[in-house]
Amino acid sequence: MYKRQKYYRLGDELFPDMLNDLRSAEEYIFVEYFIIANGVMWNAMVDIMSEKARQGVDVRVMYDDLGSISTFNANDVRQLTERGIKCVTFNPFVVLSGNLNYRDHRKMLIVDGRVAYSGGINIADEYINQKERFGHWKDIGFRVTGTPAAGYARMFAGFWNAFSKQPVPDGYTFIDPSIPEKTDGYVLSYCDSPFNADSTSTKLFIDLLSQATEYAWFCTPYL
């Protein structure tokens, strides 16, 4: 269930709201992306996260090594660490590794378990049209609050704790989903991962399609 959600047609629209929510962090900031690239977008986020880390906010960044192989490196990790920001590399790239295709395609930012961002927008300047790669860049994003945001926080914590020696504390504030919320709709936060062999996404899509009575709309860059 949700208190409020917002849909963004472009990364350009999402980015200012994301920065405002980062500035509001009081307990923790979780960042998990397939691609992180230095530039206007990332530098603005790092400036805020560094200040928050100095204030005692727990800031954690997780990125996919293959997705960010040409845009983010050990020196960037070192700089984050020096600023008090914890950082984990998902599945470090090893040539001829049998695990090469096990990638973290998640794109999400969570603040205090009360607000979360996700969608198709990575942390790179082309996603906010500050840099042109293939013409005007179109990727959607969304912002959720309340229980769905807490769900994203739990997803992050589970993945982080599997790959880091600095686990997310058990006592962190996650909204109790049993607490009633004023809603006018329904949002379910879910994920697939190497720890889940049930193909959650596939089953959900098939279930939704099976219940369709008039139409089914798809929006995807890949078929």
Regions found by a protein language model. Name each.
Residues 3-223:
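Charged, low-complexity intrinsically disordered terminal segments
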